[in-house]
Amino acid sequence: MAAPRVFPLSCAVQQYAWGKMGSNSEVARLLASSDPLAQIAEDKPYAELWMGTHPRGDAKILDNRISQKTLSQWIAENQDSLGSKVKDTFNGNLPFLFKVLSVETPLSIQAHPNKELAEKLHLQAPQHYPDANHKPEMAIALTPFQGLCGFRPVEEIVTFLKKVPEFQFLIGDEAATHLKQTMSHDSQAVASSLQSCFSHLMKSEKKVVVEQLNLLVKRISQQAAAGNNMEDIFGELLLQLHQQYPGDIGCFAIYFLNLLTLKPGEAMFLEANVPHAYLKGDCVECMACSDNTVRAGLTPKFIDVPTLCEMLSYTPSSSKDRLFLPTRSQEDPYLSIYDPPVPDFTIMKTEVPGSVTEYKVLALDSASILLMVQGTVIASTPTTQTPIPLQRGGVLFIGANESVSLKLTEPKDLLIFRACCLL
């Protein structure tokens, strides 16, 4: 009998403090559905499910026919399972980390360097930048998902400068006036002026930031108590961020960055040098294998202000333009493909109606990881006929060039996400 190249995985759960608590977390619910022995602690956060080979969360193999305990060990000894191009391009490593995130309190405002800058930062300060790789990311909403992403159109920033004097005070009159004057100029002039404004904010003295933030919080609180709607300056969000991160400079970032609320199935792609933050909700995420993060606020951690201000992409765009749209497969009516402009990963979303009795997962020249978000199936392959039961929360590794047949065991819709590398 051929050695199995398709097998279920037990994946690592990260209990970071910002995660949703207990069974409020989609991560916890997926875990409980897939593992009847899982004990969900209602007083603990379940922030991330990691599906991949990262050293801090290497997936365990749930197949007693396989001697290797973890996915990274198995891939090291079965290099052809990656796919020929993937193996050669990424030095025999799985190039992506696949995740589910359940966010209760905001993650830090951050950006990730491109490869060239990552190599430089890693050499200069490995304690802050642990590897030399870039870290593009994509998030696809499972529930309504709120985040900050990329610089707003300049017209919107100028409006906030008028409406929020505390914001203008930190930017400074000269930089703010210059931004207003360059609104109709070419993109290079706009980017330069935007960089100047953002740098003024980030380089403000902590004492001054705290003073201005306290003034703004007091003003919003008083106006709200008087029954006035403060949503034109994101009053409720500002108060929430200040409560969670009092005195943090990142509270003012909401006036610079687009605020997105993704509906389930909508996505945002975070390329190198784009400032972003996840605020609340559940999502599927995929990224290149890297831990390099340059933080900008909403964090007690190290903020490298000079690197941050120098590296960011100061190209304004609307929140609508920040949405990343999938393409529908020509071969499979149930398949949507989220294929970002980086080689490291692609995400496929499959929605199969419950009226279908069997669905075939097509073979790819890439290793892939499949996550069952909804539905119950029996999986089988042409090479190894041993059936694999999969239900909500189940995770399956699929070696390159392997197809998988999924037999629906009940008339309920399937929702499946699959991470792969399409070179």
From Swiss-Prot:
It comes from Homo sapiens. Zn(2+) binds at residues 110, 112, 137, 276. Keywords: Acetylation, Congenital disorder of glycosylation, Cytoplasm, Disease variant, Isomerase, Metal-binding, Phosphoprotein, Zinc. Its EC number is 5.3.1.8. The active site is at residue 295. It is linked to Congenital disorder of glycosylation 1B: A form of congenital disorder of glycosylation, a multisystem disorder caused by a defect in glycoprotein biosynthesis and characterized by under-glycosylated serum glycoproteins. Congenital disorders of glycosylation result in a wide variety of clinical features, such as defects in the nervous system development, psychomotor retardation, dysmorphic features, hypotonia, coagulation disorders, and immunodeficiency. InterPro entries: Man6P_Isoase-1, Mannose-6-P_Isomerase, Pmannose_isomerase-type1_CS, PMI_typeI_C, PMI_typeI_cat, PMI_typeI_hel, RmlC-like_jellyroll, RmlC_Cupin_sf. This is Mannose-6-phosphate isomerase.
